Amino acid sequence: MGYQHEKQNKDLWVSDEHGDTWLNTGDMARKDEEGYFWLTGRKKELIVRGGHNIEPKIIEEAMCKHEDISLAAAVGRPDLHAGEVPVCYVQSLNNKLDREDLLAFATAHIPEKAAIPKDIYILPELPVTVVGKVFKPELEKREINKKITKEIEAVLSNSQFTVEVVQNPMHGLLAEIQLHNCTSKAAETVDHRLGDYTLKYTVSQ
């Protein structure tokens, strides 16, 4: 059993702690109190920027018109004022791409002003599922991690901390922030700094 093409079967089957085998399709689901699993579909990809609902395909299709881009993925970056702003990750066919040139290209080719990415990241490869689809949660985790790290460093410049973004069954992507050798006051400072963001997080010491 599996996919027709053998290369798509790599890491397709996974086993849990009970020895049961599962098919890793990339879909999301929740388990109820009776042990039943409910498929909830794939993660909602719509980027909500203030009052604008942005369809990532608008960005991705425009960026893939560039002759040196083989793949593009648009995700939301947490933003204090707009909730989210769009950013775009692109897979390069060579090493000639320039960020500023791509931002200008995006401005010229994306018809919706609110959908123009605030930043563009050039990667040799984008994370993909076993069937070749871009695995956007990995990119969203990166954006959440970068935003939280930047905010904590702004208020606790000399403190040590770690940020891990995980998939939570209740909250979706959840940032778990661990402060090292910090006081409760420091934890309150971090919580106050992040409190106005729409992202989900926990702070522990």
What are these model-derived regions, one by one?
Residues E112-I122, N158-Q160, G195-Q205:
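Conserved short beta-strand edge segments in small beta-sheet-based binding/regulatory domains
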